[in-house]
UniProtKB/Swiss-Prot annotation:
Natural source organism: Rhizobium meliloti (strain 1021)
Keyword Membrane in record: yes
Protein name (database record): RpoH suppressor
A GO MF label: hydrolase activity
One GO term of the biological process aspect: lipid catabolic process
Length: 633
């Protein structure tokens, strides 16, 4: 593919299971006019983001004549076009998602219930699944109840008890079916599909999800199969002539959800340390990747007879591992288990008294999430000891907590556009008369609130719609607010999909697959109408308004009267550089004094703006943005 773009952009993609086949063609269309700097996504969007980042690295290698270890036609965006064509071929996605041993019936039931089938078919599938999942237990219960009825009342009693016995046997079968599914899920790491199938190679004429993804990432990036693509490979990739300065050539970010900690986490982990068990990872990843990670980790930590290997993080983290952690659709695709220290002990040969003295609690040393978290397992002490016990930390689909992370690469002012692709289903929400692929073309478009109708013909359907709307609100409220805000909405293209397109529809027809892929191409081409000048100006107006209002609030917070006497010493800490803070001390006297001067400047500027103006918010874009100090993840 001939490419001579001079512009750069970022790209963020939403989760959407099989709807993700929109993304490769969108990236290919964008690549005609732009070169990628930062790429991010969640769930299915993470798969597309990883593939796009790998293709971007491969393209750089081809353009810069660097060595590649793959056939040239499989590397870069030429290879991404081939991968996109494969995804759009009938049956390909279905082959990628293959159930683990013993999970076939439950897998088919989940796909049927979550897919676009009629209520009658779903009901029949649900009722019939009990007999298919637990046939022996159901029949044994029926036989036992029939035998009991015969023993008590003979043939007449057995006939009379036939219907009650069948109902009781069926209900018992429900219990056994649920227990069997629960055991299968736990055995397969909380999912019906692990993504690999090393125990059943004869049944897999094609590669399943994770094996295919590994081969695809290696091919697109031009790396050999035995050397997994890492985030460091992206960061240190070849640079184009005249490329704008940045710390990293290509940045890839994804979102996963830490179920055990109940929070979203960005990938790759750049400071947090986790461990993994080889047996668990061999069930999720290709052996060549696990072997590489074990070698990279070095000597394991052995606790209670189990070996724990340090998970490569930062530049060393394989892109495949991060992608797999983001795409673990709950119950369908296995979650990823990692481990963190639950308790630590002094290293052998250390002096207990000196160790205790050296590791006294010090909040000032907790500069990362890791330090603060591990303080909980060490009694607030610094990390000077080996893990004595581990606890499991489950990571699942990033879409659980952040399904459309359009904020991933935002800065105070943009250096280049960060585009985003949103997947919507207009038949279930009020989107007006928008075209199938919609990008706001002026500031009057894209601001309307999302509306999800609840009313249904039957009470059961309406109750279900109400419950699902609650779940969707918990999952998407922040993303929806951002997507309609000025500075965001003009850079988001919305792709409308019908109920037959994407989702858990694993058996889409050739025509449907072609239609979805075509929408992807249209989405990428839509950004040709994007005005960076208008976007940059809006972002500056947002920043000026928010900074002024925040600075005025700082002045107002300092000036309130009368002040609470008991809190006067606390107020003085920020103003008086000679006072002694209770924690998080500055590293030097100069830093402390500069911070105090900064506060005085902010107060002075806030008082001036509050009294004299001018008001930078009066004609600013609406709804108004706000500055808040919030934790990163």
């Amino acid at each position: 593919m001939a490419r001579t773009p001079a512009k750069y952009c970022d790209l963020v993609m939403k989760g959407g299971i099989t709807s993700g086949i929109v993304y490769p063609n969108a990236a290919l269309a964008l690549a005609r006019d732009y070169r990628f700097k930062n790429i991010g996504g969640t769930s299915a969007g993470a798969i597309a983001a990883a593939a796009c980042a790998a293709a971007a690295v491969g393209d750089r290698r081809k353009q810069m004549k660097a060595a590649i270890a793959q056939p040239e036609e499989r590397v870069g965006f030429e290879g991404l076009a081939k991968a996109s064509a494969n995804l759009a071929s009938p049956g390909f996605i279905k082959d990628l998602l293959q159930p683990a041993a013993g999970a076939g019936q439950a897998f088919r039931l989940l796909v049927t219930l979550a897919g676009n089938t009629g209520v009658l078919r779903k009901g029949v599938a649900l009722l019939g699944s009990v007999v298919r999942i637990a046939p022996v237990e159901t029949l044994l219960l029926l036989a036992a109840l029939a035998g009991l009825a015969y023993a008590v009342g003979g043939q007449t009693g057995m006939i009379a008890a036939a219907l009650p016995a069948a109902i009781c046997a069926y209900l018992g079968g429900v219990v056994f079916a649920v227990l069997r599914i629960a055991r299968v899920l736990r055995r397969n790491l909380m999912g019906l599909c692990t993504g690999t199938a090393p125990d059943q190679p004869a049944r897999r004429p094609r590669m399943v999800l994770t094996d295919w993804l590994h081969e695809t990432l290696q091919a697109l990036s031009g790396k050999a199969s035995g050397q997994p693509l890492t985030f460091g490979d992206l960061w240190t990739a070849e640079r184009y002539p005249g490329e704008p300065g940045s710390d990293r050539a290509v940045t890839l970010k994804m979102i996963t959800t830490g179920i055990s900690h109940q929070e979203p986490r960005s990938l790759p982990f750049e400071s947090a340390l986790f461990w993994f068990r080889r047996k668990e990872f061999e069930a999720l990843f290709p052996k060549v990747v696990v072997d590489w990670m074990v070698e990279k980790a070095g000597e394991p930590v052995t606790v209670a007879g189990e070996d724990y290997y340090l998970l490569p993080h930062g530049a060393d983290m394989p892109v495949l591992v991060a992608t797999r952690m983001s795409l673990s659709f709950p119950l369908l695709i296995s979650a990823v288990p990692l481990h963190e220290p639950a308790r630590r002990e002094s290293l052998p040969g250390s002096d207990g008294e000196n160790e205790a003295e050296d590791t006294t609690s010090d909040e000032d040393e907790q500069k990362t999430v890791l330090d603060s978290t591990e303080a909980l397992t060490t009694g607030g002490k610094k990390r000077r000891a080996r893990p004595a016990a581990f606890r499991i930390c489950w990571f699942s689909d990033g879409g659980i907590s952040s399904n459309f992370p359009i904020h991933l690469f935002d800065r105070a002012l943009p250096r280049w556009p960060t585009f985003a692709i949103n997947l919507v289903y207009p038949e279930t929400s009020d989107t007006g008369s928008r075209p199938e692929v919609f990008l706001p073309e002026n500031n009057r478009q894209g601001w309307q609130r999302h509306y999800q109708p609840i009313a249904r013909k039957s009470a059961v359907h309406e109750l279900c719609a109400f419950v699902f709307a609650i779940v969707a609100t918990m999952q998407n409220w922040r993303d929806l607010l951002q997507s309609r805000a000025p500075g965001h909405r003009e850079r988001i293209v919305h792709v409308s999909l019908s109920p037959q397109e994407g989702g858990l529809n694993l058996a889409m027809s050739k025509e449907v697959l072609a239609a979805v892929s075509k929408k992807g191409t249209a989405a990428g081409e839509a950004f040709a109408r994007f005005s960076f000048e208008n976007h940059y100006w809006i972002r500056w107006r947002n920043l000026a308004s928010a900074l002024q209002r925040y600075t005025i609030d700082i002045a107002a917070s300092d000036a309130y009267r009368p002040k609470i006497p008991d809190y006067e010493p606390a107020y003085a800490l920020a103003h008086d550089a000679t006072s002694k803070p209770p924690s998080y001390r500055f590293a030097s006297k100069a830093e402390r004094e500069e911070a105090a001067r900064l506060l005085e400047k902010l107060i002075g500027e806030g008082e001036k703006w509050s009294g004299e103006g001018p008001d930078l918010t009066k004609t600013a874009p609406r709804p108004l943005p706000q500055l808040q100090i919030a934790p990163t993840y």
